[in-house]
């Protein structure tokens, strides 16, 4: 398993800077997920690690060894793409063993390696079929099997589930997690889907405009986002953000005035390093699942339900709000959607405070 380190990595395409100083360490055996919107640099970063691109600046090390000048074939890694890239005229077994054949491995050894990988992926019965006889999920398993047979120290996945329907994506997420548990090999996975990131990763790397916004476990990113971008990107539906102003400053705390809440202000803890003064604008964030219908909570806000979304085990209520634009609340369980105006309670410990530049203050 490879321990991957990136130090000061910059990548330019002409005058465009796709990656702007990436410092990152990925422990051996970890399942690391790069997540972010389209164009954030996550696939470019994966291509640099793979060796398909060369950094404009900075270094990439595998187990302490500088990879500059080392071609992809010399990095002991395997890559799985969004496209399955299977040879249509070959059987599943021949597709999986093709790289081993090109490397000169004897046929008897190839057969053993392919059989082991097929057993792990539960596709032994498919080994004699052609790709056209397989479903999308089966083709993706073959593509993953083609990577497994090479016994790499590092797996790279570039949005491998994007071509699958919703049900198959859920199934393949489970299979990838189980594969990592069995192999304990380093894996780096690129996706724009934060659900994939949250369910698969040991550590998530959130990228935006060529920069790393935050690195942490799924729970750390969800419960303690370091800025507004991460707060909005991680979690679905996105975090509710209420605009307010600093009404008073206390030792280790801040009193925030927010129009439309009762009482009219909310006192929250403040980071010692935060530099604020009375009158400054701030935003208070609350996750939809942290809002409670009823009169409880440190403060309350009234909302008129505009529409509801029933998703089986829960219901999402949406309502316009003068400061948030729209408030969303998650109601667990099956119940009839409330109509008219309802009251929501907000607890202090559920709140996140952000400066107007997006950085976390609480």
Question: Where do the protein language model's features map onto the residues?
Answer:
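Non-catalytic connector elements of ABC transporters
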Residues: 237, 248-362
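Conserved coupling/switch loops of ABC nucleotide-binding domains, chiefly the family-specific signature
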Residues: 56-59, 109, 209, 243
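Conserved ABC transporter NBD signature motif
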Residues: 58-66
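ABC ATPase nucleotide-binding domains
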Residues: 72-229
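The feature captures the beta-strand-to-loop junction immediately N-terminal to the Walker
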Residues: 35-37
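ABC ATPase nucleotide-binding domain
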Residues: 5, 25, 61, 343-345
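Helix-to-loop junction immediately C-terminal to a conserved catalytic motif
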Residues: 50
């Amino acid at each position: 398993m490879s321990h991957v380190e990136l130090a000061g990595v910059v990548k330019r395409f002409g005058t465009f800077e796709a990656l702007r100083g990436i410092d990152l360490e990925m422990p051996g055996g970890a399942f690391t997920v790069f997540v972010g919107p389209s164009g954030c640099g996550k696939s470019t970063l994966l291509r640099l690690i793979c060796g398909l691109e060369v950094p404009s600046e900075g270094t990439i090390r595998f187990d302490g060894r500088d990879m500059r000048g080392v071609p992809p074939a010399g990095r002991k890694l395997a890559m799985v793409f969004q496209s399955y890239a299977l040879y249509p005229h070959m059987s599943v077994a021949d597709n999986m063993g093709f790289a081993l054949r090109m490397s000169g491995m004897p046929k008897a050894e190839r057969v053993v390696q392919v059989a082991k990988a097929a057993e792990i992926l539960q596709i032994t019965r498919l080994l004699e079929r052609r790709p056209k006889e397989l479903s999308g999920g089966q083709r993706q398993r073959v593509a993953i099997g083609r990577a497994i047979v090479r016994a790499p120290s590092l797996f790279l996945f570039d949005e491998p589930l994007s071509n699958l329907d919703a049900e198959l994506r859920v199934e393949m997420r489970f299979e990838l997690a189980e594969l990592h548990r069995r192999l304990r090999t380093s894996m780096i996975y690129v996706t724009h889907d934060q659900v994939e990131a949250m369910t698969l990763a040991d550590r998530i790397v959130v990228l935006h405009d060529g920069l790393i916004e935050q690195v942490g476990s799924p729970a750390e990113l969800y419960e303690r986002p370091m800025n507004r971008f991460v707060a909005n990107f991680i979690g679905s539906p996105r975090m509710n953000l209420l605009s307010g102003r600093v009404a008073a400053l206390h030792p280790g705390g801040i009193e925030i005035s927010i129009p439309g809440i009762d009482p009219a202000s909310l006192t929250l803890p403040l980071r010692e390093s935060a530099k604020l003064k009375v009158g400054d604008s701030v935003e208070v964030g609350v996750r939809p699942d942290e809002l409670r219908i009823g009169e409880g909570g440190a403060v309350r806000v009234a909302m008129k339900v505009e529409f509801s979304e029933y998703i089986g085990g829960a219901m999402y209520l949406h309502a316009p709000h003068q400061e948030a634009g729209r408030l969303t609340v998650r109601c667990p369980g099956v119940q009839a959607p409330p109509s008219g105006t309802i009251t929501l309670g907000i607890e202090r410990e559920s709140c996140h405070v952000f400066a107007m530049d997006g950085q976390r203050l609480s």
